[in-house]
Amino acid sequence: MKTKTKPEIKSDILSWWLLIVVPLVGIVVVNLPPNLRFILDRFSNTIPENFDANYRYHFSEGLRNNPNPKEAIQQEIAFYQQRLAIDSRSGLNRAALAGSYLKMARATGEGGWFLLAEQAAQRSIADLPFDNKGALLVLARIAEARHDFATALRLAKQVGSDNEEAIALEVTSHLAMGKVSEANAAAEALVNRIPNLGSLTLRALVRESQGRDAEVLQDYRQAMAVEEPGEVAGSARARSLLGRFYARRGQFVQAKALFLEALRLAPRYPLALIYLADLETRQGNYREAEGYYSKVSAYSGGVETVFDRIVDRGMARVKDLQGDAIESRRLRDKAEAGLRQEQVSGSGGFGHRRDLASLLLEKGRSQDVAEALALMQEEVKIRRDAVTLDTLAWALSSAGEWQKADRVMAEIVR
C-alpha cells in the first residue's frame, strides 16, 4: 500500500483551535450590529427545503437584540481593572481579570490577549496560592493550546474532578494526544454531570474520532434540543462542527446549510467562514471561496490573529487551483514566515509545528520534506491524534519511507 503523497488541505488544520482554544460552552464571537444582522437572514433563504429541522435554531427572535460580546468583555475587563486599582493584591479579582482576557483572546483570535491572560493568572496565583481554581483553569487552557498537555492535565487535576471545565480539559487534552479511551471516559462523565450543548458537542467530537457516526448525529441532535437562547455562539459552533462532519462524508448540501445557519447566528464566526471557504474550494467554486476567506481577514480589522495562517494557506490553494502559481507561492511563503516567527518568538506558537510541517510538505522540495519529517517526529512525542499521525505518514511517504508510513497509517485505522 502506498501512502498519499500530496493530500488536499483540509479543515483539519483547525483541529487544535476547535478542541483547545475554543471554550466548552458559550463561545464568544464578534457579531455584527443588531440592525445589520437581518441582512444575514438571507442565508436562511438559501438553505434547502430538506434541511433537517432538528438543526434549525429555534430562538431566531432573540437574535434581534443580541448584544456585541466584545463590548461586554471590554466592560468586564474595565470592571476588574477598577477593582484591582483599589486592591492590587486581590487574587480573586485578578483571576477574574485573567478569565476576561482569555475570553477576549477567544473572541478576537489575537495572541496578545492570551499573553495578558497568562500573566494575570500567574500573578493571581502568586497573590492567592490556595483555592484559586479560576487562575489554574486559565493557565491550563493556555498550556493546552501550547500543546503542553502534561501541564494542562496536572492543572486540571489540581482544580478537581468536580469542576466541569476541568473535566472538559481532560476531554480535549486526551483527544489531542490520541488517548481516545481516556477522552471518551471524561466526555461520558461530563455529559452525565451536565448534559448541555457544550458537553454533548464535546462527546460528539470524541465519538467522531471513534467512528461512531450514528451516535455522533444523536449527540448533536440532543445538543441542539437542549440549547438555550443565551448561548448563540455555542450554537453556531455546534452547527459548524456538525457541518464539518457532513462535509467529511461528502454530504456537501447538508454541510453548507449548517455553515450558513451558523453564520445566521454569528455572522462573523471565523470557523464557519473557513469551513465554507474550504467546502467551496473542494467544489470548484473558487470565487466564493476567496470571498469567505477575505471576510475572515476583513473582520479582524488588520490585527494579526490565529486564523491568518489558515487563511493564507487556503487562499494559496485556491490560487494554485486557478493556475496562479506566483500568487500561490507568495501566500505560502507568507504563511511559512508567520509560522516560523511563532516558533522562535517564545510566545509558544500555540502548537503550529504540525501546520509548519504540513506547509513544507505542500512545497515538496527535498530540503522541505526533510525538515517536515524532523518536525513531525518531534510532534508525535507529545500527541498522536489522527491528524498528527496522518501528517507524519505524509512526511514519511514523501521521504520514501513507505513501510514506516504504512505502519503509521495502520495505527490510525486501529
Where are these regions (language model features)?
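N-terminal leader/linker segments that initiate helical-solenoid repeat arrays
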Residues: 11-19, 23-134, 145-147, 154
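TPR-repeat structural position
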Residues: 73, 107, 114, 149, ...
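TPR alpha-solenoid repeat register
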Residues: 93, 134-135, 166, 199-200, ...
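Residue-level recognition of tetratricopeptide repeat
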Residues: 99, 103-106, 141, 172, ...
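Structural motif corresponding to the intra-repeat A-B loop/turn of tetratricopeptide repeats
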Residues: 104, 108-111, 146, 177, ...
